[in-house]
From Swiss-Prot:
Gene: ftsH
Cytoplasmic side: 1-4, 120-644
HAMAP family the UniProt entry points to: FtsH
Subunit: Homohexamer.
Residue stretches of biased makeup (Polar residues): 632-644
Protein's name according to its UniProt entry: ATP-dependent zinc metalloprotease FtsH
One of the GO biological process terms: proteolysis
Taxonomic source organism: Escherichia coli O157:H7
């Protein structure tokens, strides 16, 4: 940027100098007004007058010189001069030089060319590149001192680290692999959900490898000019060949490596041209020995099959969500830079954050540190981590939102309905927290936290989730009547309907339809797939699917209604507890379900306050329709209910 500014300043100074040299030359000597000149002529003091247009260079008889200008055309001037015997000399008007004439005639065109070059450089982001460098690669080569990340900074994905660490070992000691006839993979594709550490793992490879490391984004190839993408791919591999052995890292490769196909428009697809060139460079007629391509994406399903075949991306490394041990390791990495209180236990936090990615855990530690800073604390304690977890899972509190008592009561019944059904149906995740404080876009939230990491879900668990989703709407219907049911359950209905339809059409949980796939393919057209979609079911089958979905929802809807009707005393007691405390945790919910006095939440301002959640009769256990809930430690499915 500084070089460009200096260059333009130099050009401006040169142009100003040229204009000044081409301008009319100023006359030497002093200037005198025209009336004084006429008076001196009449007094016979002027010896010579050189007339050049309206300018007169005067030489007096005493040899003094000066210049004057004729303000208006004076027809008597020449007669007066001759009468007084003044020598009159006429001079032709000054003509511009040949160089000045050429410059003036070409200046507009040169100005337009300069403006065009300037804008082309700006559009290409070429602060330091020439106007014709569109096809040059934007890959940046990183050296050892530019990246400090190592494998020690990557945690929670040990298998992925082992896969990519093998590449680094090969680059350091290729003979150890070659003597056994082994060949290093030409390409490694890192696949995983967002935030799991794919790019961080690539940074660690760059920090560990002692070879040149080129990094580029998939969106840096294609721009406004045709052929730029393919040219940049060629240039990138040419640079890599000169620096071999080396590593090329392409982040978000799905931006350029999407599936080729029909698509829309029917015209030339610049992205396909770029992809074709990349396929040739990775494994074409000419080999690229010593160049390892590493790419990252969270959409492997949209990549072109030719890009994924052996010889291009030989190995796919799955970087998935971390398990409880991986989450603990990730938390310890991020906690190094945070002053911690003695009560901090990373294992406890890891068990309470199933489904969190590495980025989520980094955000958790940062939010906890911010909460501690707001409270002017010197260390971060478990209280701040609990607040940060609630904020990430349920959204930020909106205490400034004004709600009437009637709205609070309706929200309390709604959330209590979710919580009670979730505790009574089998195989459901435990209730972690219920609140009627508005969070995010919801007026209240019922959060279920799984007891462990889940891989799959049973039919019973899915039906329990459907019943729980309708618990909030049913609580409103039972308390206020069908005519006063609110729209707060709109998201619950949407989630339950999609869940039931998937059970019928994808997961084979319908006796009438059997274990067959009835769902339509949902690939987007712009991903290069065909525009036309085949219909694989008849109208009669579609009607049966709708009937099965409706029957599944009605069965679980009626089950939830029966559970709430049988436990109305708990519903009222939980509403009272929510109206008093606004937020209740698992211990308070345990007291309510057992019909005991509700203990106050931790940190409550009135430690002696209690709420008799039971009825006046003898305590009795809640009456579930199905068998009691049995914990499933292998399950990580959770819901954030309470769209109320």
């Amino acid at each position: 940027m500084a070089k460009n500014l200096i260059l333009w300043l130099v050009i401006a100074v040169v142009l100003m100098s040229v204009f000044q040299s081409f301008g009319p030359s100023e006359s030497n000597g002093r200037k005198v007004d025209y009336s004084t000149f006429l008076q001196e002529v009449n007094n016979d003091q002027v010896r010579e007058a050189r007339i050049n247009g309206r300018e007169i260079n005067v030489t007096k008889k005493d040899s003094n010189r000066y210049t004057t200008y004729i303000p208006v055309q004076d027809p008597k001037l020449l007669d007066n001069l001759l009468t007084k015997n003044v020598k009159v000399v006429g001079e032709p008007p000054e003509e511009p030089s040949l160089l000045a004439s050429i410059f003036i005639s070409w200046f507009p065109m040169l100005l337009l060319i300069g403006v065009w070059i300037f804008f082309m450089r700006q559009m290409q982001g070429g602060g330091g590149k020439g106007a014709m460098s569109f096809g040059k690669s934007k890959a940046r080569m990183l050296t050892e001192d530019q990246i400090k990340t190592t494998f020690a900074d990557v945690a929670g994905c040990d298998e992925a680290k082992e896969e990519v660490a093998e590449l680094v070992e090969y680059l350091r000691e290729p003979s150890r692999f070659q003597k056994l006839g082994g060949k290093i993979p030409k390409g490694v594709l890192m696949v995983g959900p967002p935030g799991t550490g794919k790019t961080l793992l690539a940074k660690a490879i760059a920090g560990e490898a002692k070879v040149p490391f080129f990094t580029i984004s998939g969106s840096d190839f294609v721009e406004m000019f045709v052929g730029v993408g393919a040219s940049r791919v060629r240039d990138m591999f040419e640079q890599a060949k000169k620096a071999a052995p080396c590593i090329i890292f392409i982040d978000e490769i799905d931006a350029v490596g999407r599936q080729r196909g029909a698509g829309l428009g029917g015209g030339h697809d610049e992205r396909e041209q770029t992809l074709n060139q990349m396929l040739v460079e990775m494994d074409g007629f000419e080999g690229n020995e010593g160049i390892i391509v590493i790419a990252a994406t969270n959409r492997p399903d949209v990549l072109d099959p030719a890009l994924l075949r052996p010889g291009r991306f030989d190995r796919q490394v799955v970087v998935g969500l971390p398990d409880v041990r991986g989450r603990e390791q990730i938390l310890k990495v991020h906690m190094r830079r945070v002053p911690l209180a003695p009560d901090i236990d990373a294992a406890i936090i890891a068990r309470g954050t199933p489904g969190f990615s590495g980025a989520d855990l980094a955000n958790l530690v940062n939010e906890a540190a911010l909460f501690a800073a707001r409270g002017n604390k010197r260390v971060v304690s478990m209280v701040e981590f609990e607040k940060a977890k609630d904020k990430i899972m349920m959204g930020a509190e909106r205490r400034s939102m004004v709600m009437t008592e009637a709205q609070k009561e309706s929200t309390a019944y709604h959330e209590a309905g979710h919580a009670i059904i979730g505790r009574l149906v089998p195989e459901h995740d435990p209730v972690h927290k219920v609140t009627i404080i508005p969070r995010g876009r919801a007026l209240g939230v019922t959060f279920f936290l799984p007891e462990g990491d889940a891989i799959s879900a049973s039919r019973q668990k899915l039906e329990s989730q459907i019943s729980t989703l309708y618990g909030g709407r049913l609580a409103e219907e039972i308390i206020y009547g069908p005519e006063h049911v609110s729209t707060g359950a709109s998201n619950d209905i949407k989630v339950a309907t999609n869940l039931a339809r998937n059970m019928v059409t994808q997961w084979g949980f319908s006796e009438k339809l059997g274990p067959l796939l009835y769902a339509e393919e949902e690939g987007e057209v712009f991903l290069g797939r065909s525009v036309a979609k085949a219909k694989h079911m008849s109208d009669e089958t579609a009607r049966i699917i709708d009937q099965e979905v409706k029957a599944l929802i009605e069965r679980n809807y009626n089950r939830a209604r029966q559970l709430l009707t049988d436990n109305m005393d708990i519903l009222h007691a939980m509403k009272d507890a929510l109206m008093k405390y606004e937020t209740i945790d698992a211990p308070q919910i345990d007291d309510l379900m057992a019909r005991r006095d509700v203990r106050p939440p931790a940190g409550w301002e009135e430690p002696g306050a209690s709420n008799n959640a039971g009825d006046n009769g003898s305590p009795k256990a809640p009456r579930p329709v199905d068998e009691p809930r049995t914990p499933n430690p292998g399950n990580t499915m959770s819901e954030q209910l309470g769209d109320k």
